[in-house]
């Protein structure tokens, strides 16, 4: 359900397009710049565009490197000249969700990132929950307040901010924990980022997807899990959708039932992807991921 404020602020054509997509359960394929990090900001986008990719996810790291010799306006022109739509940004700021001594500094850094990415035309921004600090049950009471503070900053820039649960996090590593915390915070500019790899390789179960309510997913990272001992899985071992053993069809159908109709952003870390030719990497991703999406009836 769209709010009155959203209706007034959103062009009718966009509202109609999204309504049709939600009703049909359709999603779009995107690629995260972490996947081609070795190529840099411009070359990653150029290669993907040549391969037919239309939706992209920007990283603060590659954008920062680009801005050492160019401008934010030029970064925007790279996107527009290639006909690319930026759907989300990795803000590159940690320490936002958990109680920690550097939280105030993290909020200041996050505000600067919001200004940067809002200027670039991004609608969404996210930060993972990764941390190795030790916590007690009492520490979880601070989470919702931290979320509200982050949400208020994002609101100033008309951004949706998302937390991505990380399988190795000592604070928020599972979907149920993140859902509970965001619901307690109840901030209108806050959503969850659902990562297929962190979900299936982490301490979650398929039934946890039933806990999601329509509208709670703000963005999705789309990968597969290799058929290796689970003890060997880490952040780098994720692979292209269709190459692994995760129940992607069932997971895609479930998030479609939850009315997600956004991008499925492929984020990979293996050197063969990050140091590979962005065009060839994107072409392989399309060849493998799009059939998976069609089989699940989300493309």
Please tell me what each predicted stretch does.
Residues 58-76, 134:
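Glycine-rich, proline-tolerant flexible connector loops at the mouths of alpha/beta enzymes
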Residues 24-30, 88-96:
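N-terminal small/glycine-rich loop or linker at the start of catalytic domains
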Residues 2, 7-12, 22-28, 33, ...:
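Histidine-acidic metal/acid-base catalytic patches
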Residues 35-37, 60-62, 92-95, 129-133, ...:
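Active-site-proximal loop/turn and secondary-structure-junction residues that shape catalytic pockets
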Residues 67-70, 98-104, 136-141, 203-206, ...:
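Short, solvent-exposed loop/turn segments at secondary-structure boundaries
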Residues 54-55, 85, 123, 160, ...:
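Residue-level detector of anion-binding/catalytic polar loops
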Residues 11, 16, 25, 42-43, ...:
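Active-site acidic/histidine proton-transfer and metal-coordination neighborhood
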């Amino acid at each position: 359900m769209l709010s009155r404020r959203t209706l007034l602020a959103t062009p009718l054509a966009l509202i109609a397009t999204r309504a049709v997509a939600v009703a049909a359960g359709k999603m779009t394929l995107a690629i995260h710049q972490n996947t081609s990090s070795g190529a840099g900001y411009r070359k990653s986008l150029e290669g993907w565009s040549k391969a037919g990719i239309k939706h992209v996810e920007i990283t603060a790291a590659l954008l920062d490197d680009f801005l050492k010799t160019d401008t934010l306006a030029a970064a925007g022109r790279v996107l527009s000249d290639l006909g690319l739509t930026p759907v989300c940004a990795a803000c590159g700021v940690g320490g936002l969700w958990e109680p920690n001594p550097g939280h105030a500094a993290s909020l200041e850094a996050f505000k600067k990132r919001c200004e940067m990415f809002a200027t670039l035309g991004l609608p969404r921004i996210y930060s993972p929950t990764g941390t190795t600090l030790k916590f007690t049950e009492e520490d979880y009471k601070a989470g919702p307040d931290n979320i509200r503070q982050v949400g208020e900053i994002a609101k100033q820039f008309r951004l949706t901010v998302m937390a991505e649960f990380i399988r190795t996090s000592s604070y928020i590593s599972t979907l149920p924990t993140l859902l509970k915390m965001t619901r307690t915070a109840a901030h209108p500019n806050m959503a969850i980022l659902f990562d297929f790899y962190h979900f299936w390789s982490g301490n979650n179960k398929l039934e946890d997807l039933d806990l999601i309510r329509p509208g709670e997913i703000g963005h999705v990272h789309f990968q597969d899990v290799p058929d290796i001992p689970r003890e060997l899985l880490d952040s780098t071992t994720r692979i292209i959708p269709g190459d692994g053993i995760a129940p992607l069809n069932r997971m895609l159908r479930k998030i479609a039932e939850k009315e997600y109709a956004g991008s499925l952003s492929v984020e990979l870390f293996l050197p063969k992807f990050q140091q590979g030719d962005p065009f060839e990497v994107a072409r392989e991703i399309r060849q493998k991921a799009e059939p998976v999406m069609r089989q699940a009836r989300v493309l």
